From Swiss-Prot:
It is an enzyme of class 2 (transferase). Esterifies acyl-group from acyl-ACP to the sn-1 position of glycerol-3-phosphate, an essential step in glycerolipid biosynthesis. The HXXXXD motif is essential for acyltransferase activity and may constitute the binding site for the phosphate moiety of the glycerol-3-phosphate. Belongs to the GPAT/DAPAT family. It catalyses: sn-glycerol 3-phosphate + an acyl-CoA = a 1-acyl-sn-glycero-3-phosphate + CoA. GO terms for cellular component: membrane. This is Probable glycerol-3-phosphate acyltransferase 2. GO terms for biological process: CDP-diacylglycerol biosynthetic process. A motif (HXXXXD motif) lies at residues 339-344. Keywords: Acyltransferase, Lipid biosynthesis, Lipid metabolism, Membrane, Phospholipid biosynthesis, Phospholipid metabolism, Transferase, Transmembrane, Transmembrane helix.
Amino acid sequence: MSGNKISTLQALVFFLYRFFILRRWCHRSPKQKYQKCPSHGLHQYQDLSNHTLIFNVEGALLKSNSLFPYFMVVAFEAGGVIRSLFLLVLYPFISLMSYEMGLKTMVMLSFFGVKKESFRVGKSVLPKYFLEDVGLEMFQVLKRGGKRVAVSDLPQVMIDVFLRDYLEIEVVVGRDMKMVGGYYLGIVEDKKNLEIAFDKVVQEERLGSGRRLIGITSFNSPSHRSLFSQFCQEIYFVRNSDKKSWQTLPQDQYPKPLIFHDGRLAVKPTPLNTLVLFMWAPFAAVLAAARLVFGLNLPYSLANPFLAFSGIHLTLTVNNHNDLISADRKRGCLFVCNHRTLLDPLYISYALRKKNMKAVTYSLSRLSELLAPIKTVRLTRDRVKDGQAMEKLLSQGDLVVCPEGTTCREPYLLRFSPLFSEVCDVIVPVAIDSHVTFFYGTTASGLKAFDPIFFLLNPFPSYTVKLLDPVSGSSSSTCRGVPDNGKVNFEVANHVQHEIGNALGFECTNLTRRDKYLILAGNNGVVKKK
């Protein structure tokens, strides 16, 4: 009997020993082959040129933890108003889902049915929003690395141009999208494919350069943490508290300056901003219609006060131009301005209270041409014909010309065409700047007929018009008889460009209309005649 008790006791002890001791020993974590460090430890490295930095875009580069604004940009710009409203309505439910499920849902809502060939949001619109969300401290660390590898859960088409072209990241590993017949299905490839692509990149890096691999990710990214731990000797983790203390990357420190960008949205579409935008839309439609009707039909003495009352701010700065503006002249004045929106000539007319002004344009929609209260004439891009047309218009009154040939939203001036310097003795440079809150009044790939309407949809748009000191044209008596008159034309055009740039604090460039449209729309910007 006592022997049975002893055997039973031994069995119980052996069971407990196996269950608690051996089980714990067998399932304990293996010794880690990497070091876990806080992200601020990276700043202690004096030289990272012999290291390959592998970082998670959402967790370690961008300040914001929310991906909603980027998918809202895709939904609004590529899918339209209804799709973006649908995404906003479903966002409360998406926020309750897991990270992976919420991401897949937003991809489905934003990309389903979008044609691949016409999708240019990732190249022309999204880089602006991503750049405005980059943390300065982390960017400075990445800039010191010998090679940078970006890993992201976002679709490759959303992040590739932003990382490669604007941040000069050598390798970008994102998730591919499934397609049928050239249309996106709104379904991203499984994470296993992302891991396979990442594994291939890392193996090539190991065999090719032999650099030490350092991983940078977030505490909130367990999938990337396990992925990095397989290959990296060191892993640095970014906390949310670290991100809150980061500064935003300034524009003057962009590796490649952001000169051109497209899209209608001028505000970052966070959930709150998007909700405010849709709540404002009904009032904006009524306000824009009132501004359009009364602004075009009332005399300037009544139109200007009404537009100011409706929220449009117009500022005019004039330096002793009364002799040019008010005096009777045989020929009109040539006002040469930089190009911000299609409304530039109209606001010069409003500012000077002169309704008999005329404007020449390189491209203008039929609707805008019909609605314009001042006469507009299209240029043919034939130098002789355009010069004759401008001289004829000057004989009839004042003329406004935008020699850039297209608009630019950022503080840069495109190259000025020298044609204007040949048609008038006295040129009045005009520096123009405009600001909006919700919508841009320009587009490269959208419908240009809606440009003025989108500008008027803003609650408080503003225009600043500065008349600068007059400049002598190449047709003046001082320039006649010069052997190389073509060189004088370019010198006058460059001088006017620099005067306007200095007045606005803008940087002068040699970029042209063709450069802009090749980047934003994939064409050379020439409007086909119908």
